[in-house]
Amino acid sequence: MTDLTQLEMIIEKAFDDRNSINTTTKGEILESVEHALNLLDKGEVRVVKRQKNGKWHVHQWLKKAVLLSFRLNPMQIMTGGVNGTSWWDKVPSKFSHWQEADFKKADFRSVPGAIVRHSAYIAPNVILMPSFVNLGAFVDEGTMVDTWATVGSCAQIGKHVHLSGGVGIGGVLEPLQANPTIIEDHCFIGARSEVVEGCIIREGSVLGMGVFIGKSTKIIDRTTGEIFIGEVPPYSVVVPGSLPGKPLPNGEIGPNLYCAVIVKRVDQKTREKTSINDLLRD
């Protein structure tokens, strides 16, 4: 197959002409999109890659490949459900046609009820409880995806992360300029928390239960008063909070507004030695 530079050029050109692409399109375009998705599925490429300066670079052409696949793939029966049940979809399971040898080679644990769509990469030593990992996502080694947690399209989950029960990590395919949601290495995301809209949780951070972070969420460091938007600094301990409401026109006190509060910041050694409960205890 073509090298990555040529593959990118083919997909970029096809995306510019996407209105003419449908389920009857074959040849170079179909082969290129399928190849790109297979590379994502194997972890040989990823939608977002961290650079040496700590910033994340988005490979938009890979997002475009995922979007083109929806135009190219027809709706069809997807097998593999419990007791022989099926689905009606355009995206096959990652585990379609897998045999025992494939699971052994991949070296992660997937318990009954875990759903992973093709083009999502799951690294060795990951544990997938009954959960959902969407296409284009990347889950790095040693991470736990707990029961009913969801990892959205193209989301990036780092090494040794714990996504607790019911956690939602938002996906993003459109608009194209939007960046995927990123959870960096060694983070703990508490039960029923949500991180969406391309926000970044930096390395070693702890989110308590029920923390919601989107692009409009104010993240306030109660020690310094500093306000962050869209990003939690490294080794932060974050809990839900609220901001005082502004007065209403009649002079009464207005409703409080939700925010996330950084209650403390810890260094790497403290984070490694201290239990999550102790970190969250104020």
From Swiss-Prot:
Spell out the InterPro entries in the cross-references: DapD_Trfase_Hexpep_rpt_fam, Hexapep, Hexapep_transf_CS, THP_succinylTrfase_dom1, THP_succinylTrfase_N_sf, Trimer_LpxA-like_sf
Q: What is the organism field in this record?
A: Bartonella henselae (strain ATCC 49882 / DSM 28221 / CCUG 30454 / Houston 1) (Rochalimaea henselae)
Q: What is its main location?
A: cytoplasm
E.C. code:
2.3.1.117
Protein name according to UniProt: 2,3,4,5-tetrahydropyridine-2,6-dicarboxylate N-succinyltransferase
Q: Which cell locations does it reside in?
A: Cytoplasm
Which reaction does this enzyme catalyse, per its entry?
A: (S)-2,3,4,5-tetrahydrodipicolinate + succinyl-CoA + H2O = (S)-2-succinylamino-6-oxoheptanedioate + CoA
Tell me which GO cellular component terms the UniProt record holds.
Answer: cytoplasm
The annotated subunit structure for this chain is:
Homotrimer.
Chain residues that bind substrate: 109, 146
Copy the pathway line from the protein's UniProt record. Answer: Amino-acid biosynthesis; L-lysine biosynthesis via DAP pathway; LL-2,6-diaminopimelate from (S)-tetrahydrodipicolinate (succinylase route): step 1/3
Stored PROSITE patterns: HEXAPEP_TRANSFERASES
Name the HAMAP family for this protein. Answer: DapD
Keywords in alphabetical order? Acyltransferase, Amino-acid biosynthesis, Cytoplasm, Diaminopimelate biosynthesis, Lysine biosynthesis, Repeat, Transferase
Name of the encoding gene: dapD
